[in-house]
Design a protein with these regions (language model features):
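A short helix->beta-strand "capping" segment at the edge of beta-propeller domains
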Residues: 20-46, 316
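Structural signature of eukaryotic scaffold interfaces centered on beta-propeller domains
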Residues: 48-54, 100-104, 146-152, 198-208, ...
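Blade-loop segments of beta-propeller domains
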Residues: 80-107, 114, 135-140, 324-328
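Asp-box/WD-like beta-propeller blade repeats and closely related beta-sheet repeat scaffolds
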Residues: 115-117, 124-153, 159-160
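Short, conserved, GDST-rich strand-edge loop motifs in beta-rich repeat architectures
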Residues: 161, 275-303, 352
């Protein structure tokens, strides 16, 4: 996930877009089931959180460790790193960004180096990990490549933005041929110039490779796409909470009392899971201001109550769980009720059992 810009708080309240029929944050969180995680033994010393996937061989994922390795395979019981690969750097089989976007296909890890436009592949070979320079992305125009998902070993889905701010979801093959692409725009508002919008997104593909979900942090919403016969088509868009904003020079500016969820999504065999840290825009701006005054980098996690929210594939709300830590990345298991979460504050993995979820 890449930060594309800063959120501006609106002081004036004219032209605020009030939509009818949206849920309030309380709808998702008021009846949340409280659960506690079981921490694994290993505590990581790293510059960023361990984003990983559950595989039969261990947790396979990425973080920048003390020895500047970025790809790691960790023990499923203890979380201890068993083997590492892929150095931070400019050379072959190295990565220029410390927190690349990740995707899992089979038991291989795909890493998108957004600074170098490279797709790297990390494979498990017995007791070792091997890194391959898989593909240098080039789609005919200068683009910033943000998110990656894997349809097959020869077909990728990329979320990208060109220099005019236009955001696209692109299917591309191993020869950089564009199979299909659609323009991404979450707000249906003729007054909004989407090319000027800057916000975080995350993109996840369902295990069956048929449905693609894109979440918008700023507007706390999720778009659902279908991939069929090489075509990408929009199926549905859901605003989880009401977005109140004013439009200034084509840019939607969130009203200070608006609640954003800081939502991140993960798609399992049966459900879509979302982590959420609900926060008022005014509180977020104050938190960022304090961080600047103290000369420190503000964390991505606000330190508020954290939740795991469960939806079905049609984005219908199922239930939510209030967790005992700042969960950042989820590693889903074959059991839909058992997940592992990366704790942002403690930088370790925790095992959670989602009560009453079958």
């Amino acid at each position: 996930m890449i930060m594309l810009g800063l959120l501006t708080v609106a002081s004036c309240k004219n032209e605020i877009k009030d939509k009818i029929g949206y849920k309030t944050p309380e709808f998702y969180f008021a009846d949340a089931i409280e659960i506690k995680g079981e921490p694994l033994d290993a505590e990581y010393v790293a510059s960023n959180v361990f984003k990983c996937f559950y595989t039969p061989y261990g947790f396979l994922g990425s973080m920048r460790s003390e020895d500047d390795k970025l790809a790691h395979l960790a023990d499923l019981k203890t979380g201890e790193i068993k083997v590492s690969a892929c150095s931070f750097g400019r050379g072959p089989e190295e990565i220029l960004i410390s927190s690349p976007d990740l995707a899992l296909y089979g038991n291989s890890l795909y890493m998108l180096d957004q600074r170098a436009d490279w797709i790297k592949k990390v494979e498990i070979h017995g007791d070792t990990l091997k890194t391959f320079d898989l593909q240098k992305l080039s789609l005919g125009e200068p683009m910033f490549f943000i998110e990656i998902q894997i349809v097959s070993d020869s077909l990728f889905v990329i979320f990208a933005e060109n220099f005019n701010g236009e955001k696209k979801i692109v299917q591309v093959d191993r020869d950089n041929n564009i199979v299909d692409s659609v323009v991404y725009s979450f707000l249906d508002d003729e007054n909004v110039d989407c090319g000027k919008c800057r916000y975080n997104v995350e993109m996840e593909l369902s295990p069956c490779k048929k449905y693609l979900y894109v979440s918008s942090h700023l507007f706390s919403g999720i778009s659902k796409y279908q991939i069929e016969d090489g075509k990408i088509s929009l199926v549905d868009k859901v605003m989880l909470v009401e977005p109140k904003y004013v439009v200034k020079n084509g840019i939607p500016v969130m009203e200070s009392e608006n609640v954003i969820l800081n939502n991140r999504i993960f798609v399992g065999e049966k459900y879509l899971y979302m982590t959420a840290d609900p926060e008022k825009v005014s509180d977020m701006k104050e938190r960022e201001k304090r961080a600047r005054e103290e000369g420190r980098r503000e964390s991505a996690a606000p330190g508020n109550d954290s939740y795991i929210v469960v939806f079905d594939y049609d984005l219908n709300f199922i239930k939510s769980y209030r967790v005992d830590s700042d969960v950042w990345h989820l590693a889903l298991t074959p059991d839909p009720s058992v997940i592992y979460a990366s704790d942002y504050r403690e930088n370790r993995l925790k095992r959670y059992v989602l009560a009453d979820l079958k």
